[in-house]
Amino acid sequence: MITKGAKAIIIGAADGSQLGTQVAAAKKSGAVVIAWDRNILNTENVDYYVAFNNFKVGQLQAQALLEGMEAKKADGPYNIELFSGSPDDANAKVFFNGAMDVLQPKIDDGTVKVVSGRTSFSETNTQGWLAQNAQSRMTDILTKSYTNTELDGVLSPNDTLARAILTATKAAGKPNPIVTGQDSETASIPLIMKGEQYSTIYKNTTEEAQAAIDLVSDLADGKKPETKEDKNNDNGKKIVPAVELTPVLVTKENAVEAYKGNDTLEELAKKG
C-alpha cells in the first residue's frame, strides 16, 4: 500500500509492539497512520487510534462482577480472583486498569478479598489469551487457596478465558462463581442466558469500522477529526489522539435488547 501511494493506512494489529519499522515507512511516505482496535506501541508514527473505550470496558466488567456477587449473596466480604489479558496486547493492561479503578477501593475497604494475593497485571496476565493458560492458573489457584473457601467471583477479561475459568471450577467440583467476559462470543451467549457466565461486553465492530472510515473521510475533506487525548491511549512514545466508541455491558437481563441489529447474537439471546 505504501508503494502504491496510499494517503491513509488503517492497521488492525494482532501484536502492536512489532510494527515500528512498518509504520515508520508509512509515515515517511506521507501516509496518515491509523491504529484500529489495538494501539500500535512504542512509536511516534501513529497519527490516530480508533477503538472502543477500553478503560471503560474494564470498569464495566468490575461493576458487573460486584453487582453479580451482591445479587447472589447480599453480604460480603466477597472472595475473588483476577485474570488479565496477554502482555503483548496493548489493550490488555488498559482493561485491567479500568477494572482495578473500580475494584481497588473495594479491596482496600475489605468488601472484596483476592484470596490468592495476586493483584497486579504481571501476576494475573494470560500469555497469548490462551484458554489453557487461564484454566491451568485457575486450577492452581483453587488447589492452593480454595480448599475450604468459597470463590464468589472472577474478573475475566474476555469470553474465551471466562469459559476456561468455568471449566476449571466445574472440574474442581466448585459452584459457578460470578464470571465476567468480553467480546460477545457465540459460545458464551448461551452460557450467559443459562446463568453460568454472568456477563460479557458487546463492541459493535461495524460501528468501529465505520468510525475509521469517517475519520479518513474527514481527513480527505480537510476537516479536523473530533478526537480525545486520553492517558490510557499512551503507546509508550505519545498519547495517540483517539476516536473512542462506547462499549455495552451485557447480562441475561438485557441481552436481547443489546444485540438488536446483530441477527446472530440476538437469535442466540432469544433462544435462552
PLM ranges: what are they?
Residues 1-272:
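A residue-level marker of the well-folded mature domains of exported/periplasmic proteins
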